[in-house]
Structures are given as C-alpha cells and as structure tokens.
Amino acid sequence: ALPILSETPGSNIVITNYDRLHRFDPEAFSGVVLDESSCIKHHDSKTLKLLLQAFEQTQFKLCATATPAPNDWTELGTHAQFLGVCTQAEMLAEYFTHDGGDTSVWRLKGHARELFWTWVSQWGAMVRKPSDLGFDDSAYLLPNLHMHEHTVKTEMPLNGMLFAAEAQTLSERRDARRMSVEDRVKDCASIVNSEASEPWVVWCDLNAEGDALTKAINGAVQIAGADSHEVKEQRLADFAAGKFRVLVSKPSICGFGLNWQHSARMAFVGVTDSFESYYQAVRRCWRFGQKRDVHIHVFASSAEGAVVANLKRKERDATAMAESLSAETRDAVMQSVTGTTRQTNTYNAAKSVVVPSFLKAAA
C-alpha cells in the first residue's frame, strides 16, 4: 500500500492494490474509489465478493473504468450492485430477458431500452471526450492509430487434424500459439530491432513468448508475474524514465493504468480473445498527451484467424455500446454532471398553412 498521510485524524488517503485489501479495516474509511473497476465485472469473481463484503456500509463509493462491460451490457449490473443501486439479479429481472433457449444469454427488452439507459444515467456516466459534456474536443483529439497485422504461416496441423486448419476452440488456439512462438518472436524482434531509437512496448501471452522476446530483442527488459512487487515497480519506473528502450510483459501485469506517452510503438506477440486486455494495453501509449501517431503491430499465426476475428468483433460491439450509452444518456449525464440540459425552442404555429392550388392538384 502507498499511504498518503494527513495530520488530521480520520482524513488519511490510502492508495493500494486490490490484492492488499485484507490489510485494511474498511470501517475506518468513509469513502472508496475503485479505479480500473472492470475487475468486478464478473458476478462470481472473488474480487467482487470481497469488495461487496468490505464496503457494503461505506457511505461514499465511486467506480472508474473505460471498460465497465467489455463483453455485454449485463456486466453493468455488478457496478450497480457495488454502488448499492440494486443487485445484478434485480437489474436482469427488470430490464433483460433470456434470449431463446440459451439461459446463459440475456437480451435487453425492446420496450425497456430507453428506460434502461435512463436508469443507468442516474448512477453512471459515459464520458469519452469533452463533447459528451457539451465542450470542445479540439484540445483532446488523439493522433492517428495505425494497425499492422503480421500473419505467420502455419503448416503443422493441430492435434487430431490431418491438415493445417484455423483453430476454433480455446485449447486449439493455445496449441496454435505454442506451435508458432518461434516464428512470431522472430518476426517481431526483426521489426523492433530495426527501429533502434524507438521505445517499444511488447505484449506477450505465454511465458515462453516473454522469455524468447527478451532474448531476441536488443535491450529488452521483461516484467514477469514471478517478479516481486519491488522489482516490478522499479522496472516500470525505469521504462517510464527512458532508462531502457523495450519493455516486455503481459497485459494482465502491466496493461492497466500506466502512462507511456513517450512510446509510440507497440507489438502484440500473443493475442487472446480478451478485448478488454487488448483495449487497455493499447491505451497505455495511445492516450491523452500522446503527440505522435501510434503504430500497433499484431503478430498471429494463420491458425489464429478466429482469435483475431473475434477480437475485431468485440471491438465493434464495444464501440457500438459506447455510442449507444452516450447517445441515450447524453442529456441526463449533462444534467447530473454539469447541471445543464440541451435547450430547444418549440415552434407553435399561430396560423394555419395555406396549401397552394398547384400542390393540391399534384396531390
């Protein structure tokens, strides 16, 4: 934990990680803020259960995240539950229905759409840019984001297959990644080493990928899960300060909450189905304060086509969700956040319209 102490008793502010919650007495705090609160999106997650139990009686609560529901709208329910608005089960019963015969799939009721977003806007706000609150975006516009896809040809068939084919199941996708580690690392290292003056962030998914990348890329330093908190903290600080050029790590370790605007190059050598991890990882460099165009390189084997396609689908769905929430709740959000609403003038005709004779004839 990183405590910021005050001389006034009872007014201390403490900043800490979720995994250190057990070291604190929740009753000693009058307010709690969950940053990167998407960690509570799963209704059965251990983190959500611990936080619900710890801060049930806390007076002031705030959740902040760019991806509150990276998979579907029902995940908004866990945020409502933590904030004390209602339980996720109550939200589902009120606004959602089972979609067909699959009882695990929930669909927003057609007649409840407007009511649902109005309800969400009473306790949540989707603010992506100043114009969402009625302000000018000119000082907030990000530089261009360039995506480069690199496909490694895979000739070796997956287990049980006669010919090489695109992986479909999760186990097949992991097998495909393992079989193409050497080729993907080689292609990535070639590009990273060719830009010796550019700081790079290189993301991996498997330990074997991280180890191989660190060896193949000149000056690369890896942050692994097995490293101590002290080692991770020091290496993160060193990379941000420019003490080494290339950082290799997993999105699950370094993909959230960090600011690396000094880097405009990024590579994904391990691609998973998690759009949230991908989105958050990209945003470490492509964020407010970035002055240059950002280039993202994605390395995947030809057998991982289903993974890349699924990631793109989730990106489209997430964009559509953000657009819908912003459009549906804009007026309510402006009222609750800025105290203003959109003003319109209604025209009430004082005289009846006289239709010209030639229009009557045409009709």
Predicted regions and their residues:
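Conserved interdomain hinge at the start of the Helicase C-terminal
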Residues: 172, 177-205
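Conserved helicase ATPase core of P-loop NTP-dependent helicases/translocases
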Residues: 201-203, 211-212, 218-254
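Interdomain helical connector at the RecA1-RecA2 junction of SF1/SF2 helicase-like NTPases
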Residues: 92, 100-176
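Conserved P-loop NTPase motor "coupling/switch" region that bridges the ATPase
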Residues: 9-10, 31, 39-42, 48-132, ...
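Conserved helix/coil segment N-terminal to the catalytic DExD/H
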Residues: 7-31
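A short beta-strand element within the Helicase C-terminal
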Residues: 28-33, 75-78, 258-271, 294-298
